[in-house]
Amino acid sequence: MKIQNPALIRAVGVAGAFLVRRLVGTTEFHFRYADPTVNPEVARRTGARYIYAFYHEVLLFPAYFWAWPEMQILISDHRDGELIAQTVLRLGFGVVRGSTTRGGARALREMTGRVDRGHLCITPDGPKGPRRHVHQGLPYLALRTGLPIVGLGMAFSNPWRAKSWDKFAVPRPYGKATCVFPEPVIVPPDAGREVLEECRAEVERRMRKATDEAEEWVAKL
């Protein structure tokens, strides 16, 4: 059943944020960096800005660990996205509604306008997939903003999986989680369509490699 009542949606967001803090808060987190300066904690101190990209299925990882007001995240403007938006807003994220595909121009303009507030966060395979595919809007956003793209690989240990297009991961209590940061991808300021596609493919390649590494790592912990 679809929830349409705005007050009920807000209430679900409050409850969702509480559950995320309680559930994901029991997780033991591990991080690996190809370049330590892209660590959001370090960038927060130095004032550096990045576009952080992570797959839709592992949204609960950054939703808990990096829920800061300077993290501006793009959430789908589909009806289902409203519940996610209300939840991450109450966790502490800055929220932009839209996607890099459907209605993408408006969302990209608004994300570009948020650069002075902090980092930009994207689930590049959202809102409807294909799973672990990077859409073209991500390198275009990097072109517009001049920010490097850091495509993260994340994994939970033996998570519950939703029967959805992305196999959304819900961590089990007191489990472990890993995050691998590859080198950032920098989109040239004069990039045309062909170069943008090359950058898109490179981000996707690095994200898949980092995800494989994160999944292999968490299985050994």
Regions found by a protein language model. Name each.
Residues 42-47, 65-68, 114-116:
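Flexible, charged surface loops at secondary-structure boundaries
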Residues 27-31, 95, 179:
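Generic structural signal for residues in well-ordered beta-strands
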Residues 48-102, 161:
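Catalytic core of membrane glycerolipid acyltransferases/transacylases, capturing the structured
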Residues 41-44, 101-106, 164:
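Short acidic (Asp/Glu) patches
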Residues 21-49, 55-61:
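A short, well-structured juxtamembrane/interface segment
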Residues 37-40, 63, 85, 138-139:
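Short amphipathic alpha-helical segments and helix-helix/interface helices
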Residues 1-24, 69, 86, 90, ...:
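Non-catalytic C-terminal accessory region of glycerolipid acyltransferases
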